[in-house]
Amino acid sequence: YVPPKATPETFTKLKQTGGLETRYRWSRQHPMAAYFADAAAMPALLRFDAAETKSSGWANTSFVLSCGNWVFAANALMNPWVHLETRHQNFAAIEDGAEVAVQMVVEALFEKKGHQFADVRINLFNAISRAPLATIWQRAIYHLRS
């Protein structure tokens, strides 16, 4: 799959019809599972080897926010694009082995100084139960002025 080129028309269509849902699996094998040089320095809830807690190996914020970037890039071909601002809220832990369904809604489009901007709302769900996991609001420049 190659997404359509990022243009005002592409993002207007995404705003009207919605975008492609993407899925990602969180596990101890994921490259983001140990995002510190020393995994033992990570919070116990995020480590897979944490004996001091029964709840361990939960997805870290880097994975959650990356899901937002990945779905954004999966819906429109952008090169380059500039991630400007993010706000997010977690609703539930993403546990080891969870498949995460990610959906994006375009909330606003605007132009400033020749740059094309998009404000998007990204929602993460458990792919099986459809329980909400997190929400992300993101602002990005998807097309730099020529």
Where are these regions (language model features)?
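Generic detector of well-ordered alpha-helical segments enriched in charged/polar residues
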Residues: 43-46, 65, 69, 139
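Non-catalytic linker/capping segments at the edges of enzyme domains
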Residues: 1-56, 74, 143-146
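Hydrophobic beta-strand-centered segment that forms part of the acyl-chain substrate-binding groove
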Residues: 61-106, 135
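Generic preference for hydrophobic/aromatic residues in regular secondary structure cores
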Residues: 22-35, 82, 86-88, 100-102, ...
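Residue-identity detector for glycine
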Residues: 18-19, 57, 68, 97, ...
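HotDog/MaoC-like acyl-thioester-processing domains
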Residues: 1-12, 90-146
